[in-house]
Amino acid sequence: MTEDQAPILDFWGPLRKTTQSRIGLGRAGDSLPTKRVLEFKAAHAAARDAVHEPLDSETLASRVDGVGIGAPVVVASSVSTRSEYLRRPDLGRQPADLSAIKSSDKEIGFILADGLSPRALMDHGEQLLSALVTALGERYSIAPPVIATNARVALGDHIAAAMGVQTAIVLIGERPGLSVADSVGIYLTHLPRVGRTDADRNCISNVHPPEGLGYEQAARVVLGLVTGARQLGRSGVDLKDTSRADAVASGEVLTLD
């Protein structure tokens, strides 16, 4: 085999298997290879579809009911259409009608919100909720869950106040990107009330196994944050997640072959 016939090694191939990020795209003249251009267009289309796809609240409610913490109530924000939801974030933070929610004296309240990716909630909502209930259920009382459509994170404050819970945990579809269109974010607010800001919350993002954070891993982080928030008396910027340091100390770290 001559030097000109030597095989071309794909340096990026092994690295590409470890991430969904768009790395090592290559070149074809002054542009990208056709394969990479088509991959980009497909990812963009998937992100657009995830944003505009409506939540199948009936199917999700049936799945959530099977978790065993009570039949979920379905509520909506003040948004009338999906396009209005994208144009008016403020309306997504305001409830339309919360009269169906019954107040309780429970400690934890789960709100499953479609957010910017209803697909994420359909793909991961039930399994993530089940993992959270398993992690928290032995220590804390849990109210029947609420499903919210056309919802922003702050809508959870209104819902949690109506639920009468001490800690609100919002599971919401995150804004799709060009590598992930089905990621769930978890927002924890201790002593929720209308008017809370993002500084009063803790967020665990990128929940979408197998590529992203796993359900059980996320549940362990949430358990630590809930315990810390109750000890501290508040959530937000003063409450730190130490689970990563604990994982390193215990030897539970990611290694690449």
Curated annotation (Swiss-Prot):
GO terms for cellular component: ethanolamine ammonia-lyase complex; ethanolamine degradation polyhedral organelle. Its cofactor is adenosylcob(III)alamin. Adenosylcob(III)alamin binds at V153, E174, C203. The keyword Magnesium does not apply. Belongs to the EutC family. GO terms for molecular function: cobalamin binding; ethanolamine ammonia-lyase activity. Catalyzes the deamination of various vicinal amino-alcohols to oxo compounds. Allows this organism to utilize ethanolamine as the sole source of nitrogen and carbon in the presence of external vitamin B12. It is found in: Bacterial microcompartment. It is an enzyme of class 4 (lyase). Its main location: other. It holds the Pfam family EutC. Keywords: Bacterial microcompartment, Cobalamin, Cobalt, Lyase. GO terms for biological process: amino acid metabolic process; ethanolamine catabolic process. InterPro entries: EutC (IPR009246), EutC_C (IPR042251), EutC_N (IPR042255). Its EC number is 4.3.1.7. Binds between the large and small subunits. This is Ethanolamine ammonia-lyase small subunit. The basic unit is a heterodimer which dimerizes to form tetramers. The heterotetramers trimerize; 6 large subunits form a core ring with 6 small subunits projecting outwards. It comes from Rhodococcus erythropolis. Pathway: Amine and polyamine degradation; ethanolamine degradation. It catalyses: ethanolamine = acetaldehyde + NH4(+).
